[in-house]
């Protein structure tokens, strides 16, 4: 109990909102040690999973520069770096990139499983490394994406996760809604980086990747199509 209390206090000591713009009752209840703890996907809920939300290290680098070795500051994931709840409240220009880093451990009962790394959404262009191995890239600020990181994991001990994001906001061609670098009379700001839950999930070698559910009201039918990770004749 004492250890838990100390850990909780340490988390709060390292984080506080950056300013007080657009505060709500819910923003005042944010706990850096338990950020958005609910299962993040509305379908295919699995019992075993591990949230990676919380305090991460971050650095802002020039676009195209080498990945940093030193990270001096912290950010609360999954809140965009421009937001108050990130604890940072900084802008990242189209000439810069945002790099995140954190360590994680794989639970012992996940041994022998495939491990998926999920991102609810990252704005905009994302590259991901695990233990120095690039596991994938994704372009798009609104859609979830996942990588199978099993082959990049260490057999024991801590693993390192590195995420690099580039977002040109209104200097690019991507869909961005009301995000602008100079909002003038409105409060809309750019949304750069991780802004939805990040989590790990153990699965079997064959698992359901996605479900496509199609209703037919006239015929009173519901068709469910499961997309599998690997298929063989007879599956």
Regions found by a protein language model. Name each.
Residues 210-217:
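Short beta-strand segments of immunoglobulin-like
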Residues 1-7:
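Bacterial N-terminal signal peptides
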Residues 12-49:
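N-terminal pre-domain segments of enzymes
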